[in-house]
Amino acid sequence: MLKREMNIADYDAELWQAMEQEKVRQEEHIELIASENYTSPRVMQAQGSQLTNKYAEGYPGKRYYGGCEYVDVVEQLAIDRAKELFGADYANVQPHSGSQANFAVYTALLQPGDTVLGMNLAQGGHLTHGSPVNFSGKLYNIVPYGIDESGKIDYDEMAKLAKEHKPKMIIGGFSAYSGVVDWAKMREIADSIGAYLFVDMAHVAGLIAAGVYPNPVPHAHVVTTTTHKTLAGPRGGLILAKGGDEELYKKLNSAVFPSAQGGPLMHVIAGKAVALKEAMEPEFKVYQQQVAKNAKAMVEVFLNRGYKVVSGGTENHLFLLDLVDKNLTGKEADAALGRANITVNKNSVPNDPKSPFVTSGIRIGSPAVTRRGFKEAEVKELAGWMCDVLDNINDEATIERVKAKVLDICARFPVYA
């Protein structure tokens, strides 16, 4: 018999220890991976609820199983909030991840072998935008576009490639691009050849929800996002569209269920509903504004300390440090900063001479530290410590000094107070 007092700590000490250690790690390390964030306790409450017990294949009002009257309410709340938040008239909240949302878009709009124009992974794109190791690169004919010498998207090149290759779909969005994308320009290019414009806004969804970054929903045929990252919700995906094309909406729904997934994760959808409601609050806008301010403040310090920032700055929540001139690899920088309790990820930079497993850069993002309460003063101090480590990458004494400062500031700015 199940009892409410059952717990992991008493039953599975080995697992509980790992969970507790991860909790400590999150509190005692500064998180600068651009795709990571902290959910609210409300989101975690939803994800730990009895909704995890319920199978609900289908969509609200059209389920294959009985007993769905209350999970229908949960999913409809998430759908309605997603549409309201992003100005869409269609939303599917069932994708288990951003990659699965993207997979659904491909299968809804394309046939295997169709040509797709997507951002080059080495210049800021994402695996699902055409990498040869991903389904997108294996099933479709991918033509990559990239950035110009200033580090900005080269729309002239994009237009030229579109005219030459006649892709059926053009993908906007990125995983490591610090600029503002001109969604209207991309739609203009897509329309010029009769292609779909599909935007993956996963990295900037929170900024978009707060009005800090341009919204692609009015311009794209289809938009996807994750619900974590800047949106600060549970790990999951979301598909949005606007324009009233009911046939398109049916294709998208079918591409999620029954094509790619079976039963939706109702406890995660409840978490999405909570996060979407939180994103409508005034304090969420203040938070996202601070995310952008903090990223700019960090860039300023790195530039002043002689580090090269790809594109020379940032207009969103992330930026790339190019370490080629410092004769450092991204792998070395990642490891050294990690020893100082600062978590980043190695990342390829434009024209990177190193392999993706080594790289010549690191990606830095401000969402998680801003969630802790860091403002410009704190992130500038943090960026200075990072420069100290990178300037003395083999000096363990410097790394230990920085680690002590990190532990102190983490104690002053806890993740969960």
Swiss-Prot record:
* First-tier enzyme category under EC: transferase
Q: What is its main location?
A: cytoplasm
Which CDD domains does the record cross-reference, listed alphabetically? SHMT
**Which residue numbers mark the site Plays an important role in substrate specificity?**
228
Residues where (6S)-5,6,7,8-tetrahydrofolate binds: 121, 125-127, 355-357
Provide the species name: Salmonella typhimurium (strain LT2 / SGSC1412 / ATCC 700720)
Gene Ontology terms, MF aspect: glycine hydroxymethyltransferase activity; pyridoxal phosphate binding
NCBIfam families in UniProt = PRK00011.1
Record keywords = Amino-acid biosynthesis, Cytoplasm, One-carbon metabolism, Pyridoxal phosphate, Transferase
Similarity remark: Belongs to the SHMT family.
What pathway does this protein act in?
One-carbon metabolism; tetrahydrofolate interconversion; Amino-acid biosynthesis; glycine biosynthesis; glycine from L-serine: step 1/1
Q: Which residues carry this modification: N6-(pyridoxal phosphate)lysine?
A: 229
**Know the name of this protein?**
Serine hydroxymethyltransferase
Q: What Pfam families does its record include?
A: SHMT
* Reported cofactor(s): pyridoxal 5'-phosphate
Q: Which reaction does it catalyse?
A: (6R)-5,10-methylene-5,6,7,8-tetrahydrofolate + glycine + H2O = (6S)-5,6,7,8-tetrahydrofolate + L-serine
GO cellular component, alphabetical, reads: cytoplasm; cytosol
Q: How does it assemble?
A: Homodimer.
Q: What does this protein do?
A: Catalyzes the reversible interconversion of serine and glycine with tetrahydrofolate (THF) serving as the one-carbon carrier. This reaction serves as the major source of one-carbon groups required for the biosynthesis of purines, thymidylate, methionine, and other important biomolecules. Also exhibits THF-independent aldolase activity toward beta-hydroxyamino acids, producing glycine and aldehydes, via a retro-aldol mechanism.
Localization per record: Cytoplasm
Q: Does the keyword Zinc apply?
A: no
Q: What is its EC number?
A: 2.1.2.1
